[in-house]
Amino acid sequence: MSDDEHSSGSGRLLMGLTWAVLLLALWQWGRQVTEVRQDLSAPATGDMAAVGRPPDTELPPAARPLGNALPQRIDIPDLGVRAPVVPRGLDRQGAIDPPPFDRADTVGWYAGGARPGAAGAALMVGHVDTETRPAVFYKLSSLRSGETVRVIRDDGRVAEFTVDDVQVQSRDRFDARQAYGQHRPGRAELRLITCGGTFDQDSGSYTANVIVSAYLTGTGH
């Protein structure tokens, strides 16, 4: 995983990438966590564990998508997360490039995809930990269906998302399209992605990915 900032030419390169290449890059990112040595792990049970689906949870209807605007901050009240958001591209290996480890409390937004609040599935990534401490998405797997994620945008609006699914997916049987594709056409959706499972010292990577799916249900100022 590269700690370098993506170059100014990355945006032009990313616009030419196919959706399949993006999915592969996201999968590669999860496999390349080699600098984290602590065994700070998120829960995982099975190949694709649904950890955020309380029974009989009634979710609100989807709101109309907003126009395009850049994300500036993400708030997850139930986790106590208030983090700046920075645009990211792909690294030299073609994997999505998260913020560097010295900015482990920052969330990266994939700038080649949808913008949070606009139609499509916007992708955000963050570290689960560093060598020495938990990072911004350390508690991500504890989110539950019905809880709220807010993205503050540069147009002054707050895109309010409701969590509808939390998955811990084994890397051995990873369904990239299910994880990152839009679940319902026409909706504004959000994916929050980090490492999960346990840290395998031999391979230098985590055994799973935590993927939170949410959709736009309101706006604020």
Features from the language model and the residues they span:
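Terminal targeting segments of Actinobacterial cell-envelope proteins
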Residues: 1-13
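Hydrophobic H-region at the start of alpha-helical membrane spans
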Residues: 11-22
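Solvent-exposed, non-transmembrane regions of membrane-associated and secreted proteins
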Residues: 23-144, 150-221
